[in-house]
């Protein structure tokens, strides 16, 4: 039987980003250790292997699926998403990062800014992450003079992508020493936690709108049924509520029979919570990532829409050349990515990098959609544009 979840502190979702092997997962472990001590054991210490949990990850020592870790600071309760650092798994980072309230950029004090450091900051900008804080890790192995240069380089990088590089807090840590019990290193982790409390604003949660949760993952729990996980985008869900599963296939109705967060039971889940929702009478194969769970009748699946789109320039990491009628990139919406064909409107022959354009899009599969839905457009492993649904056609 799961224990009840204590909601006496506001909940906030943050993530770690940064180059592979710069210590993102070790930092997550160190934070759980310090938080467990701070909270009198209310937070479970997660060791590296528990966070880096998929078998192929452990073999390669690389985080693939975004892992969620819980911690409590002096002011808030957090879900920490350990965003993947390997270039093949950028797709997961997009869905992980786009659902966070802020990010910790982890940079090794030995290596400094690396190609993926740049790529992740660019992605954070593209998916609209509101704030970033910096952790310079591995300071026990680094040259102090080099650390000053790395700080300058990180500030320049953040400024380049429109984050406030001059004022962003940069905290120096040694996650590994903190894990091994070094008291000074633990103070560095505590300083990082305090900075997150103070610098990342508590987001306003949309509680008064109809319930909606994009599905990130699906599990089958023996004897209990099917659980879908994700971050609640808006509204509230209570045990016993009727919900619909919308998008990608025919809409299905079911009942929520349980809500859990970090293996603790909730009487209700609300906007901003990372939860698992138990569904009555739904088989594991009846539901998939990319669908949404929603209050019945509040959202419908669509394939065709018009959108206002901004196409990234080459300097922003986008295309070097224009695209034409019938261009077929991928559209990333919430937790799904679907191929769509673009029709250019008002007699346009092409769309150039840097253009703002109104386009008509026809997706190969229907997704849960309402007016104003944001999406990223990607092709060949890079983001080439961003847009919003302005009109639903069918």
From Swiss-Prot:
GO cellular component terms listed in the entry, alphabetical order: cytoplasm
InterPro entries, per the entry: EF-Tu_GTP-bd, EF-Tu_GTPase, EFTu-like_2, EFTU_2, G_TR_CS, P-loop_NTPase, Small_GTP-bd, T_Tr_GTP-bd_dom
Catalytic activity line of the entry: GTP + H2O = GDP + phosphate + H(+)
SUPFAM superfamilies on file: EF-Tu/eEF-1alpha/eIF2-gamma C-terminal domain, P-loop containing nucleoside triphosphate hydrolases, Translation proteins
CDD domains listed in its UniProt record: EF_Tu, EFTU_II, EFTU_III
Location (main, coarse): cytoplasm
Annotated segments matching region G4: 137-140
Magnesium as UniProt keyword: yes
Region G1, residue ranges: 18-25
Subcellular location: Cytoplasm
G2: annotated span: 61-65
Binding-site residues for GTP, renumbered to this chain: 18-25, 82-86, 137-140
Region of interest called G5, as start-end residue ranges on this chain: 174-176
Domain tr-type G: 9-204
Enzyme class of the recorded protein, top EC level: hydrolase
Pfam (any one): GTP_EFTU_D3
EC number: 3.6.5.3
Region (G3): 82-85
Keywords, ordered alphabetically: Cytoplasm, Elongation factor, GTP-binding, Hydrolase, Magnesium, Metal-binding, Nucleotide-binding, Protein biosynthesis
PROSITE patterns linked: G_TR_1, G_TR_2
Binding site for Mg(2+): 25
Molecular function, one GO term: guanosine tetraphosphate binding
Entry's family note: Belongs to the TRAFAC class translation factor GTPase superfamily. Classic translation factor GTPase family. EF-Tu/EF-1A subfamily.
UniProt-listed PANTHER family: ELONGATION FACTOR TU, MITOCHONDRIAL, ELONGATION FACTOR TU-RELATED
Complexes and interactors: Monomer.
Name of the protein in question: Elongation factor Tu 2
Gene name tied to this protein: tuf2
